[in-house]
Amino acid sequence: MADVVVGIQWGDEGKGKIVDRIAKDYDFVVRYQGGHNAGHTIVHKGVKHSLHLMPSGVLYPKCKNIISSAVVVSVKDLCEEISAFEDLENRLFVSDRAHVILPYHAKKDAFKEKSQNIGTTKKGIGPCYEDKMARSGIRMGDLLDDKILEEKLNAHFKAIEPFKKAYDLGENYEKDLMGYFKTYAPKICPFIKDTTSMLIEANQKGEKILLEGAQGTLLDIDLGTYPFVTSSNTTSASACVSTGLNPKAINEVIGITKAYSTRVGNGPFPSEDTTPMGDHLRTKGAEFGTTTKRPRRCGWLDLVALKYACALNGCTQLALMKLDVLDGIDAIKVCVAYERKGERLEIFPSDLKDCVPIYQTFKGWEKSVGVRKLDDLEPNVREYIRFIEKEVGVKIRLISTSPEREDTIFL
């Protein structure tokens, strides 16, 4: 059976810590979408690990880690991540169906961002998915056969010839890309496998599989705040499509949310706080992107968005992250509805334009940091937790009270 960990906000919810905390109980940890535009930060024994492509189970020696078919892979960045770990043989597997991000994709991404102003990371994620959908992409499995790779690259060179100048690819792009693959392909090829068959077999054997998403539900290409979204499907349903596991294999869906809200880049954010309180949340919560180091926009918990995300994913339980960031705040707001042109909205709309948050205010608390038992939390904290559970209709089973792995309350 497989369990899914999915972010139910705009990403950066703390999925990495949760996966790291529970990965020891699983045989496989699988990253199922996105690329190196995402980032997980894990603190283990006082050491901070920043992961962008690697599944969060790499810190457990007995855990097998898979990068599945819907992930887009920068071979250079993956090689750099691999070099930071030891003994990954037979512990890391990259799907032969996953698509390869080329330097061209990053150049195209940066070029398009100038006019679209979406707030992308300019890592080439979107353009790589574009080529995938156009059936012209290069897959990881192509790296295993020099002849096939050469054919794919020649087709790529022909296709991009009219755009070389616009995307500033340089006169030696073809030669440089050939050298790029000669450098990195030998390092990555030993990890390329048919991971779909591996996971189907593992599920049939009854092995435990944890499926790890990147970004968050509200960034889903179809169901998020379009066009300010990522280029992949980020909900739990996409875990099946990417891995080859059928829906019957899914057991628990664990939705991850912060005790407040954040967003990176442009796009609507009804509960954003642009006062000094937003700055306080950013500073105390260290809200700066793992990948881009960009400051995250911060605000209050949005229950309209949270209920929507829980429904989309079929969440069976929640993990509440960064509760300690709210310590010491006298009055804590929660968005319970929107108002738009005089109308009260309690259902998340497809367009958030003109939506103004309607807040309910709670009394704050002094300290929750480092607490590991529910009974040790102050009454006002417990009231806040109960209210979230009641409004969303899903039980909170895990609460994080600091970045440390051990500072976690299990319910």
Curated annotation (Swiss-Prot):
InterPro entries: Adenylosuccin_syn_GTP-bd, Adenylosuccin_syn_Lys_AS, Adenylosuccinate_synth_dom1, Adenylosuccinate_synth_dom2, Adenylosuccinate_synth_dom3, Adenylosuccinate_synthetase, P-loop_NTPase
Catalytic reactions of this protein: IMP + L-aspartate + GTP = N(6)-(1,2-dicarboxyethyl)-AMP + GDP + phosphate + 2 H(+)
Ligase in keyword set: yes
Residues that hold GTP according to the record: 11-17, 39-41, 296, 322-324, 400-402
Subcellular location: Cytoplasm
Amino acids binding IMP: D12, E13, G14, K15, N37, A38, G39, H40, T121, R135, Q215, T230, R294
Cofactor note: Binds 1 Mg(2+) ion per subunit.
Example of a GO MF term: magnesium ion binding
Tree of life domain: Bacteria
UniProt-annotated catalytic positions: D12, H40
Listed Pfam families: Adenylsucc_synt
Top-level class of the enzyme under EC nomenclature: ligase
PROSITE patterns: ADENYLOSUCCIN_SYN_1, ADENYLOSUCCIN_SYN_2
Positions annotated to bind Mg(2+): D12, G39
Family in the record: Belongs to the adenylosuccinate synthetase family.
Role according to the record: Plays an important role in the de novo pathway of purine nucleotide biosynthesis. Catalyzes the first committed step in the biosynthesis of AMP from IMP.
Name used for this protein in its record: Adenylosuccinate synthetase
